[in-house]
A protein has these predicted regions:
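N-terminal Rossmann NAD(P)H-binding glycine-rich loop of SDR-like oxidoreductase domains
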Residues: 3-27
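Oxidoreductase cofactor-interface core, primarily capturing Rossmann-like NAD(P)-dependent enzymes
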Residues: 18, 25, 42, 117-227, ...
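Conserved glycine-rich Rossmann-like NAD(P)H-binding loop of the short-chain dehydrogenase/reductase
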Residues: 27-34
Length: 493
């Protein structure tokens, strides 16, 4: 049955993945956003009604719920700073009042697993307070209390990812030994989509979690195994308060302190499924719930397949729910190291492309020959291929061709060449060249040349490798850009 659905938090991690799946299920979706421009690049933006509004303004909420059957409340304000818990409560009160007045038939809220009868962290206590406010609204409400959500872009998953990749050993405050029950984002979306059509007499809070109950330390080491990293030994610590831990997380990872602190606070408790009443309301997905390691594999699938573009946040919502989206936070996803150069030249795009396509082999790399030769020798000394392979053809390339210790991953003749490194490095590396027409300041026409070296480091060793080479990269890639452009200009003369 098609329903009219309002999604709050559509610019967020879960909302941005839920909205297109509700559309796919045949529902008519309205997305509420304070800044509708943030949804402009969403692949599904043309399939939904986007309305501007602020949940802290009751009149905005009343307009948003007009004519709606179901409200999905997916806004969490912990990244906003200040008294975010009070802001979340006010927003929930507005949603509850407006939904009741408008005759909304169902509210669905995504909260967090928490123990009963214990003093909770601010993060979990806020989730409980919001859920209770919505349950008391007089509108049939389902509160889904989820474990740690596993998928690229999820704040909890990104903290696991970055801590595991950066730390050679695992500091072990008490909460590293606490139990959690992670759940794959695909399974969270299964429950959310199904909740839109649950009979109206269903009302209450329901635990949802994956099939695995793990200590947080096991969660980090499970990620390490799936990411191809060594398991991290545990180093006991005498004391590490949530505040100190959040400072430390902020120092060694890109996860903002404002997000790290409430997440760490929630780890002070065992957060596991205590009842399975959800199975009587919404059956598990066909094939069963996804295990933790399987969820991590799904989250890393794009990166493992070599689809570097997804790591540059160009993935569309049509992909798997565990894939990254352009709307995910900038600190989410794999760490990407990059050296980018750009030049505008009077040479024609065709002339620049001819130089680019002939790179490597006997012509070399238009850079500092000594440094390039040293890199090739170093690769051979550790069992790599070095520079000895050359290239199949001196002037033409095709996908799959070898170019010294690179391989052509993608080529759009006349426009783009992307080479994937096959040298021995602690991570994965690419170099990409693009050429396009450009207007010169003098009024004539020429070409714009862009050059990017990209590195996805593996663990702390990969990061140290890149940082140690930054001075050499500055010389190598600066000279390369200058000489490629100069060669194209010389050819044109």
């Amino acid at each position: 049955m098609s329903r009219r659905i309002l999604v709050t938090g559509a610019t967020g991690y879960v909302g941005g993945r839920l909205a297109p799946r509700l559309v796919e299920a045949g529902h008519r979706v309205r997305a509420l956003a304070r800044d509708p421009g943030r949804l402009r690049d969403a692949a599904w933006a043309g399939d939904v009604e986007i309305v501007q509004g602020d949940l802290e303004v009751l009149a905005d909420v009343r307009r948003a719920v007009e004519g709606v059957d179901v409200v999905f409340h997916l806004v969490h304000a912990m990244s906003a700073g200040g008294d975010w818990a009070q802001a979340e409560l006010v927003q929930a009160q507005h949603v509850a009042a407006a939904a009741k007045a408008a005759g909304v038939q169902r509210i669905v809220y995504l909260a967090g697993l928490h123990p009963q009868g214990q003093r909770l962290s601010k993060h979990l206590a806020s989730r409980v307070a919001v859920g209770e406010t919505l349950l008391a609204s007089g509108v049939p409400t389902i509160v889904l209390e989820a474990g740690i959500v596993i998928g690229s872009g999820s704040a909890s998953f990104e903290m696991i990812r970055h801590l595991t990749e950066v730390l050679p050993y695992m500091p072990a405050p008490r909460w590293v030994r606490n139990f959690v029950q992670p759940i794959a984002i695909r399974d969270v979306l299964h429950y959310l989509v199904a909740a839109a059509e649950v009979p109206g007499d269903v009302h209450g809070a329901f635990d949802i979690g994956g099939p695995d109950v793990l200590r947080y330390g096991q969660v980090m080491n499970g990620y390490a195994v799936e990411a191809g990293l060594p398991q991290r030994p545990i180093a006991p610590l005498p004391v590490l308060t949530p505040w100190l831990a959040s400072q430390w997380v902020n120092l060694v990872t890109p996860v903002p302190r404002a997000i790290a602190m409430p997440l760490i606070g929630s780890l002070l408790h065992d957060c596991v499924v205590e009842e399975h009443r959800i199975d009587r309301v919404i059956p598990p997905p066909e094939g069963g719930l996804t295990g933790y390691r399987g969820a991590v594999r799904l989250a890393l699938a794009r990166e493992r397949s070599g689809d570097i573009e997804s790591s540059w946040r160009s993935a569309s919502s049509a992909g798997a729910p565990s894939d990254p989206l352009p709307s995910d936070p900038k600190w989410s996803g794999s760490t990407v190291m990059e050296d980018a150069r750009e030049r505008v030249t009077s040479a024609s795009p065709e002339a620049v492309w001819r130089v680019v396509e002939s790179i490597g082999g006997d012509r070399g790399w238009y850079s500092v020959p000594l440094l390039w030769s040293i890199r090739g020798l170093a690769d051979r000394l550790v069992g790599g291929v070095g520079l000895r392979r050359g290239r199949r053809d001196p002037v033409r390339l095709r996908a799959g061709d070898v170019v010294d210790f690179w391989r052509v991953e993608r080529i759009d003749h006349g426009r783009l060449l992307r080479l994937r490194a096959e040298m021995r490095v602690p991570g994965r590396a690419w170099i990409e060249f693009t050429v396009e027409p450009a207007q010169l300041e003098s009024g004539g026409s020429g070409a714009r040349y862009r050059q990017r070296a990209i590195f996805l480091p593996s663990g702390l060793g990969g990061r140290l490798y890149w940082w140690s080479l930054v001075p050499a990269h500055h010389v190598i890639f600066e000279v390369m850009a200058n000489r490629i452009v100069a060669a194209a200009e010389a050819e044109a003369r």
